[in-house]
Amino acid sequence: MTTKSKHIILSLTFLLLFLSTVFSSHVTQRFTSSDDITELVVTALNQTISNVNLSSSNFSDLLQRLGSNLSHRDLCAFDDCLELLDDTVFDLTTAISKLRSHSPELHNVKMLLSAAMTNTRTCLDGFASSDNDENLNNNDNKTYGVAESLKESLFNISSHVSDSLAMLENIPGHIPGKVKEDVGFPMWVSGSDRNLLQDPVDETKVNLVVAQNGTGNYTTIGEAISAAPNSSETRFVIYIKCGEYFENIEIPREKTMIMFIGDGIGRTVIKANRSYADGWTAFHSATVGVRGSGFIAKDLSFVNYAGPEKHQAVALRSSSDLSAYYRCSFESYQDTIYVHSHKQFYRECDIYGTVDFIFGDASVVFQNCSLYARRPNPNQKIIYTAQGRENSREPTGISIISSRILAAPDLIPVQANFKAYLGRPWQLYSRTVIMKSFIDDLVDPAGWLKWKDDFALETLYYGEYMNEGPGSNMTNRVQWPGFKRIETVEEASQFSVGPFIDGNKWLNSTRIPFTLDL
């Protein structure tokens, strides 16, 4: 039996057992009300949380058992899983809290469940390279059996969350209302944050200063993050003065509402060189990893300088909900930005890469950004995006609006030697749209690339709408069932800032132009 077959059977078994248990106490009652279905979902999620906690405990036990026998990448994979399972418990607990509120926002609940599914898949991704790893597979049979059982438990958890996501569809009135059109920042960017984004740096209005020359509170960014308060409900601003900071930065989940302000792209630079080739998982390779919600970055560069031969080497990994990046650059080659999960927004940013250089399963909008393809390795294809939506009910995807898809200076002289594509489907329901953007002539007339064989060609959603430039001609685009020539503003608008990242309430106009809708 294949792993996929086991996954399907486990999913169906769980759903049947769960429903029979719940319905046994309501034999004569029809579950038609919102409250009934909500209680079904809450019961399912509570059981899933118990399963996640058990899996986390088993992962810890196995890690202790294997200890020094593990390769560095396998150690990273275990660390990834323990962190991601902890995040999953948090996401599911938050989802339950929102469901039980007086006016649950089901779009946000779906985002949380989507993030939980992404977490389990990311955990599995970390072990993908371990199938042939002697340190893991050539341990005693009992240990190997436990490892395989843990992998199966992750499939099971993801399946349970998927079932809950399906049940949400049956709650009456779950369809979000019409979005109000306005101009401004998203509702989760407050008035004071808006001023911080617009105005020059005033050191009297920041909480901490990082400076390599000793003129600030700290000389490293890591020290400043450690000094920031936990679970802050107000903005905590860290001004990072001009300089190159060779650090791998992790902003943990408890460090909320952090804001980085630099002195400009190329002037304030955070850089490191972890990579898959050097024994790191893609998740752990990030120069900067952000988990704490409400993160904002302005006027700085995130760089992974591992190089094109090192494979996955992430500059930024963000699972920060309601995070925003303004006038920043992100520079690497393969897997530059890992838009891992939750809702994110990028404005006037420059992104440099070669292969899948924007990837992940967040709900993310790139507006007025420039995507630069760099010179890849010989015979390598250039792919701008690889979106990771694995369930048709996930509200996730990559939306690129009013942006520029270009060749970087190092590619321009030799771009005729390489083929470039807008994206390829990393997962079954991959979803990416490009709207009102300039697409240069480096993009192949087909536009999009297969992942492998016919995988996801019928289930993906790749859309283009009112683009311009020599690469925007759709005459010879792929003929896949999932490719869409978006023809109406109604269809296109669902991927605009308002509906797509839940920006249904906005602030008034600001000095930074920001269009809510198309």
UniProtKB/Swiss-Prot annotation:
One of its GO terms (molecular function) is enzyme inhibitor activity. Pfam families: Pectinesterase, PMEI. One of its GO terms (biological process) is cell wall modification. Disulfide bonds join C349-C369. Pathway: Glycan metabolism; pectin degradation; 2-dehydro-3-deoxy-D-gluconate from pectin: step 1/5. Residues 207-504 are annotated as: Pectinesterase 40. Residues 1-24 form the signal peptide. Substrate binds at Q312, R424, W426. It is an enzyme of class 3 (hydrolase). Residues 25-167 are annotated as: Pectinesterase inhibitor 40. Expressed in flower buds. SUPFAM superfamilies: Pectin lyase-like, Plant invertase/pectin methylesterase inhibitor. Glycans are attached at N46, N53, N58, N69, N141, N156, N213, N217, N230, N273, N368, N473, N508. It is found in: Secreted, Cell wall. CDD domains: PMEI-like_3 (cd15798). Keywords: Aspartyl esterase, Cell wall, Cell wall biogenesis/degradation, Disulfide bond, Glycoprotein, Hydrolase, Secreted, Signal. It comes from the Eukaryota. GO terms for cellular component: extracellular region. It catalyses: [(1->4)-alpha-D-galacturonosyl methyl ester](n) + n H2O = [(1->4)-alpha-D-galacturonosyl](n) + n methanol + n H(+). The record marks Q334 as: Transition state stabilizer. The keyword Hydrolase applies. Its EC number is 3.1.1.11. In the N-terminal section; belongs to the PMEI family. In the C-terminal section; belongs to the pectinesterase family. Acts in the modification of cell walls via demethylesterification of cell wall pectin. PANTHER family: PECTINESTERASE. This is Probable pectinesterase/pectinesterase inhibitor 40. It comes from Arabidopsis thaliana.
